[in-house]
Amino acid sequence: MPSVRSVACCCLLWMMLSVQLVTPGSPATAQLSGQRTARGPGSAICNMACRLEHGHLYPFCNCDGKRDVVSSSMAV
């Protein structure tokens, strides 16, 4: 039975490989439904990784000072 950590890592890897982020005005890019503005590279991946405390696995993510969505306190 796979552990929660390995399942979370697989989900993050799947998201990183399957989600194509959109930059405004760029030709031939798919846009996710309901998306109005482009987000920074990997921001959805970083947000999830920081929430799951796996940000250290992604060197481009900066989890310092991210707000905890549930308690609205600063994450440590």
Curated annotation (Swiss-Prot):
Aspartic acid 1-amide PTM sites in chain numbering: 64
Predominant cellular place of this UniProt entry's protein: secreted
Summary of the tissues where the protein is detected: Expressed by the venom duct.
Assigned keywords, A-Z: Acetylcholine receptor inhibiting toxin, Amidation, Disulfide bond, Ion channel impairing toxin, Neurotoxin, Postsynaptic neurotoxin, Potassium channel impairing toxin, Secreted, Signal, Toxin, Voltage-gated potassium channel impairing toxin
Disulfide feature: 46-61, 50-63
Origin: domain of life: Eukaryota
GO CC terms: extracellular region; host cell postsynaptic membrane
Propeptide boundaries: 28-39, 65-76
This protein's record includes keyword Cell membrane: no
Signal peptide: 1-27
Single GO molecular function: acetylcholine receptor inhibitor activity
The keyword Transit peptide is assigned to this record: no
Compartment(s): Secreted
Function summary: Highly inhibits both nicotinic acetylcholine receptors (neuronal (alpha-3/beta-4) and muscular (alpha-1/beta-1/epsilon/delta) subtypes) and the voltage-gated potassium channel Kv1.6/KCNA6 subtype.
Domain free text: The cysteine framework is XIV (C-C-C-C).
Similarity annotation: Belongs to the conotoxin J superfamily.
The protein's name in its UniProt record: Alpha/kappa-conotoxin-like pl14.3
Organism: Conus planorbis
